Amino acid sequence: MAEKKIAFRNRQDFSKIPATIQIPNLIEVQKRSYDRFLQMDLLPSERDDAGLQAVFQSVFPITDFRNVSQLEFVDYAIGNWECKCGHLKGLHHLRTTCKNCGATVVTDPFHPGDVLCHKCGTFNANTPDFCNKCGDPVGLQLKYDVAECEERGMTYSAPLKVTMRLTIFDKDPETNNRTIRDIKEQEVFFGDVPLMTQNGTFIINGTERVIVSQLHRSPGVFFETANNRTYFLGKIIPYRGSWVEFEYDQKNILYVRIDRKRKFLGTIFLRALGLRTDEDILRTFYTVDRIAVKDKKLYWTLEPGIERPTNLVGLKLSHAIKAKNGEEVAHSGRKVTASVLKEIQKHKISELEIELGDLEGAYVASDVIDTNTGEVLLEANQELTADKLSKMIDAGIGEVNVFFPERDDVGTVISATLRRDSVKTPQEALIEIYRKLRPGDPPTLDTATALFHGMFFDARKYDFSRVGRLKFNIKLFDRQDPTGLDKRTLDPDDFYHTIRYLLKLRRNLGAVDDIDHLGNRRVRAVGELLENQFRIGLVRMERAIKEKMSVYQEMSTAMPHDLVNAKPVMAAIREFFGSSQLSQFMDQTNPLSEITHKRRLSALGPGGLSRERAGFEVRDVHPTHYGRICPIETPEGPNIGLISSLSCYARINDYGFIESPYRRVKGGRVIDYVQVTHAGDSDYRVGDKMEKSEAQKANEELRGRKKRGIELEPYSFYLSAWEEDKWTIAQANAELDEKGKITSELVNARKAGNFVLISRDDIDYIDVSPKQLVSVAASLVPFLEHDDANRALMGANMQRQSVPLLRAEAPIVGTGMEGVTARDSGAVVLARRSGIIDSVDSERVIVRVEGEHHPMQLSREVGSDIYQLTKFKRSNQNTCINQKPIVKQGDHVKKGQVIADGPCTDHGELGLGRNVLVSFMPWRGYNFEDAILVSEKLVKEDYYTSVHIEEFEIEARDTKLGPEEITRDIPNVSESALRDLDESGVIRIGAPVKAGDILVGKVTPKGETQLTPEEKLLRAIFGEKAGDVRDASLTCPPGIEGVVVDVKIFSRKGQEKDERAKQIEGTQIAKLEKNLADEIRILTDERLKRLEGLLGAKVVQADLHDERTNKRLLTKDAVLDRETIERISTRNLKRIKYADKDPRVNEQIDEIEEMTSRQIDVLRKIVREKIEKLQKGDELPPGVIKLVKVYIAMKRKLSVGDKMAGRHGNKGVIARILPEEDMPYLEDGTPVEIVLNPLGVPSRMNVGQILETHLGWAGHELGKKIAEFMVENSEAGQVRKHLKQLFKDTAFVDHVTELDDEMLLKVAKGMQDGVFFGSAVFDGSTEAEIKSLLDQAGLPTSGKTFLYDGMTGDRFEQPVTVGYIYMLKLSHLVDDKIHARSIGPYSLITQQPLGGKAQFGGQRFGEMEVWALEAYGAAYILQELLTAKSDDVYGRTKIYEAIVKGEAAIEPGVPESFNVLIRELQSLCLDVELIKTKEKAAPAPVAAD
């Protein structure tokens, strides 16, 4: 794998199949789609007709009803593009002109190197404009960044401004011609459009959300069977608009259905399309031949030289055919074949004599009319019988057009339907269709025509889409070229082709479609989903604009902003992000769950399936899923198969179809291809693809001529599901020799969805990698190939639920995907530019950027990058996001290198759990049924301790009775309850809190009550505060115990801030100032470095005195060094005399000074603006004066009841935590850390966990061996020799040989905790390799050893499997689930207690439990449970009174549910009364003494 090795962790890789291409960026799906939708960083002239641009152009221009004014769309802009100081404005500053074709070329200020012109393929110099004040290029400047939006509960967005043009016309009342009176253009603010963050998510109202891509049925034409292949169905499905279905029944009648309404005859539809007569319809679908009558003989006429279909083929000749020269072309009785027909045409024979019997089954294609009398002898579509023919001959008719429905591919359906059809004109047909679609509406010809035309031929109402047109062309014409795809409505020919294909299906010509084939399902990603919402909003807005234009009094003075109200558009966007089924709260449990959520595909959602109606076929794994959708990762519940995940290498093409990469195979040899990334001095163009050998030859030739070579990258062929069907594709594990030739004669391959054994010469492509099949989560499971599919599914899903631990640890047995996943998830911090680490602490890393330019060229590659690390931030799932630096001061970092670990990452690799020593054995019944026995060591040493952060907020509002107040002065609360609140009433950071503690004190005004004179007097004497307010403080809810880690206070603008808010603000300002000081220090250092490069080591020729004080600063012959330059001012530096001084030096000194001071000024200005923003106050919802957020961190140690799991679906609950000394121990006295039940393996068939155990043990022990060796030998040569001995016969030996001494020692040091392995999915280590490693580690090759009972010291009878497994703690923690209720809330209507932890509810004593008590005759317990403890409101109060008075009697009242029943009956108009009758009083129960 070509990944950068980070921080010296080397995984020993077992894979035999080299990865030829890198895994594409894992969240590219989201980013690419949204970028294509917004096209925000492109100028209007550069935008494609896609996304927002396409939506605006499809809805505009909008014309009023009178046709005298028109509103057009000109262009749009998103966000403010300017430099840091605001001096440069506009995107055009990031453009240059192509030296070859003059087109505008996009430059990239952050990546040095040439930029490509996409029009002509020429490379141009990368020359964006840099501001001469701040030295920065133009960038998107936002009001609030991501972190601020999360804190303040805002949406991360940028303003959308649209330029509109309003044209007003004068209309000539006579001719109706329009002339332009006035044109006005104006920019209209539309609203804020949410932006995507770097990690592919959206911040909506302060919470991070993900838009899940939807898998839906592709638009196009589809054919399917109905009723067990007796007849077929054809559908034309558009992207937007009416569906059309064609079907025929057993009686061979063609029907059409529009939008699933009532069906009508197909010929009515054809007439409405413009086929006026029966003859038109018949000629469109059937092959028509001309039969001539001469001298009462019949002749079949042919048109020589013109190849057209004829019904002659298949006919037996009744007369021999002779050429003009008398040569016999075909003898009589011969069957006419295609070759005979060619001969006939070759000899230019124009007619063949036939007999009457040859016309059996013929029908006339056009009316046969007696020219003398005008009588219609035969109507079109009538059968041509012998007596009809003789009548014709008698009438002297010389020719007749015939067709043969039985012989024709199309069959008898059209002919039979025509006979049923009573409608004869297109006008009647349109009215008939209108009646079917709008039953009840009286039809007129105009409305019927408008309706029918609008359905399929109006681009505003019907969109077949580029995809639909592409699928249509592929299905009906097998044509894939991208031309003609912009024809997005239908025309009559499209319907004719569809009907023709449908009718031919009966003759097995063509194929029906498999609806679950991935060629027929496509992905709608974020951009497209949002595009549809925008269109909905714009269409609503269009109606409003049209109405406004019509009623506006004075259109001549109107401006575009008077007409446009963008609220419906922004409401549609808000609704989509806030409440759409596909806009989901991001699963942020750990980095893997984030990545998986972004790569998820859902078949649910608007326009998709519903889980109730989805059948088995849709959910099932389909052969086309191979390499596109993971067959393993899918939920276990009702959504199984409907929600899936993209495979590792899969990508989504421009049409929305999923593609998978393959390598080319020619003649049984795998050919590596490359793609040109820079043409150098060759004639190739960027993007050209060629064989690697050809490229290498070209490069050698260029180097020989001392020219610049071609820059290349590996290329693979991405194929969509329908393209793949044409080829034969071998699996990645087919054995190859060193030249790439497939070694075995027969190869396992896939062809058109079937798995076949085929000759190697017939192979066209081969898979890129075995990982290609599975998704990211499944590719993180080592030995996946040894696990049963159901368990692999659980393993992949449970990794997503793993909780970030206090100390992350990468797995000893990994798969090699850990680094890629961590990097692409955004959990780790990557260096933006190369440089040297200037300073590091727990909160930030400063990288001093290196300028790789001429020392005098003041480049922007100067200065520093400050990385603010995230500290103890709460995630969506309340887990803790914390970043820790992994670099040291002085380290050199490259661009893209990991400089800080995030949650669940260890040295840039994903680490979801811990490596623990496990034995498989039963232990006194404590690990029965998947339960887990754990050593106390794991609790003591915080192996599985995790931190969870809860957020609580309280707002002080302005109420009708007066403002609420956040204060420490709360009525009737003891001082001890307030001990941790500061003077502002907010809890201090670091305070330990438990349930019931006050976090923020708040008082709310009470309604005024009538006071007695005595109370008024007391009020007047003692002050009135306490009386008229009540306590509304925020208290810690039950089940929460932890430490306050952060407090945030937001005050409304214009409100006086309290002390605590000022203190928090002070801390934030201090941070900003500290960063500023560091940036200024680095800039001044850089200035010195440049001055030193200019003046350093120069010898002074004369003494230098200060101009003003005349103090001597330098003596003659002094040598200028850094310190000297630093203490002399710029003014005096310019006066220094030394040998061969360049006259331009003083200019250069001025330039350096000016640049530095300008950059420092800009930095100060930016910090000043940030401080002003902090001091200004916050934007809060209406009515809110102050908002306080308190964050509480809880430490969750491993405890009994927590759920743990391995990566193979082996999950269980902790049943007991045993003291270390009681755990079973190895022969050297090491106690095991976890005991698992061996019965969990055989029936589950997840043997991967056993192989992982063995390999993990070997890795751990080898690490121990290296550590022991390095204690005695720290010399590099010795270490190298030792490592070579340990890893003999592996690829790692070559790696050890290549490393220099310093790196070698670092690698060896990194191996002391264990040797890390990469056992890739389907290409992992073999049993023999594991045995060999166990042997090298000095362990038994069986992987079993004898254990001793920690309680008795006795040896167990049988050897036990022992080793290291990677175990995860899942986010199903017992502390979050356990719950107890005393007295809590009751349901409002039934008055019964609520259920569930969230409602502080109780356990339901249900029907079956009542039966149990009835069986025991426990009447009093039952009475109490069903009345007082449930819904007897009167009885509840009586019991309370009885307890207070110390009485024991219980007096049940009427249960509230009885009253509910009575109300229910009364609502049905049944008058129910309760009639009380006096009963004898029952003897009271005797109270116990």
Swiss-Prot record:
Any one GO BP annotation for this protein: DNA-templated transcription
- Which PROSITE patterns does this one have? RNA_POL_BETA (PS01166)
Q: Name one GO cellular component term.
A: DNA-directed RNA polymerase complex
Per UniProt, what is one GO molecular function of this protein?
Answer: DNA binding
Query: What protein name applies here?
Result: DNA-directed RNA polymerase subunit beta
Matching entries from InterPro entries are given as:
DNA-dir_RNA_pol_bsu_ext_1_sf (IPR042107), DNA-dir_RNA_pol_bsu_external_1 (IPR019462), DNA-dir_RNA_pol_su2 (IPR015712), DNA-dir_RNAP_su2_dom (IPR007120), DNA-dir_RNAP_su2_hyb_sf (IPR037033), RNA_pol_bsu_bac (IPR010243), RNA_pol_bsu_CS (IPR007121), RNA_pol_bsu_protrusion (IPR007644)
Pfam families the record matches: RNA_pol_Rpb2_1, RNA_pol_Rpb2_2, RNA_pol_Rpb2_3, RNA_pol_Rpb2_45, RNA_pol_Rpb2_6, RNA_pol_Rpb2_7
What UniProt keywords apply to this chain's record, in alphabetical order?
DNA-directed RNA polymerase, Nucleotidyltransferase, Transcription, Transferase
Taxonomic placement: Bacteria, Pseudomonadati, Acidobacteriota, Terriglobia, Terriglobales
Q: What does this protein do?
A: DNA-dependent RNA polymerase catalyzes the transcription of DNA into RNA using the four ribonucleoside triphosphates as substrates.
Catalytic activity of the protein: RNA(n) + a ribonucleoside 5'-triphosphate = RNA(n+1) + diphosphate
Cross-referenced CDD domains, in alphabetical order?
RNA_pol_B_RPB2 (cd00653)
Organism of origin: Koribacter versatilis (strain Ellin345)
Q: What is its EC number?
A: 2.7.7.6
Subunit record text:
The RNAP catalytic core consists of 2 alpha, 1 beta, 1 beta' and 1 omega subunit. When a sigma factor is associated with the core the holoenzyme is formed, which can initiate transcription.
Q: Which family does it belong to?
A: Belongs to the RNA polymerase beta chain family.
Gene3D superfamilies recorded: 2.40.50.100, 2.40.50.150, 3.90.1100.10, DNA-directed RNA polymerase, beta subunit, external 1 domain, DNA-directed RNA polymerase, subunit 2, domain 6, RNA polymerase alpha subunit dimerisation domain, RNA polymerase Rpb2, domain 2
